């Protein structure tokens, strides 16, 4: 019942928003709620690019295969946005130093100062080659 409700909600969002990219939890996430959301997103958003993000506390074996270069302002904006989650304040896995260090690590993988890293669940696109 609950999974069907999630699927229907996602289908309604798809119709309303017509997204080009969906961000969900990585397939490496072991939290059962996160797994359910990712699985239902894969069903609801067929034909749309899906990228999985890392959750430090519940992702095991995550390695980013898609890296997006970001700058210092982006790092600060992400830290400020995450600070809005009051229920996570003070948690060891949810602090600005950890967030910044992950973005530095992903940046090193991309040979830049900072990057966001994603797991590729589905890429939909074209190479722009005309026949």
Q: What feature does the model see in each segment?
A:
Residues 47-57:
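Histidine/lysine/aspartate-rich catalytic loop segments that bind and position anionic ligands
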């Amino acid at each position: 019942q609950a999974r069907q409700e999630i699927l229907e909600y996602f289908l309604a969002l798809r119709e309303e928003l017509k997204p080009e990219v969906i961000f969900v939890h990585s397939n490496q996430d072991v939290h059962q709620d996160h797994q359910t959301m990712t699985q239902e997103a894969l069903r609801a958003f067929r034909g749309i690019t899906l990228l999985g993000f890392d959750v430090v506390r519940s992702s095991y074996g995550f390695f980013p295969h898609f890296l997006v270069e970001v700058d210092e302002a982006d790092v600060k904006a992400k830290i400020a946005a995450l600070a809005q989650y009051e229920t996570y304040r003070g948690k060891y896995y949810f602090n600005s130093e950890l967030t910044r260090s992950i973005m530095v690590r992903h940046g090193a993988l991309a040979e830049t100062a900072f990057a966001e890293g994603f797991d590729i669940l589905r890429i939909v696109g074209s190479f722009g080659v005309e026949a």
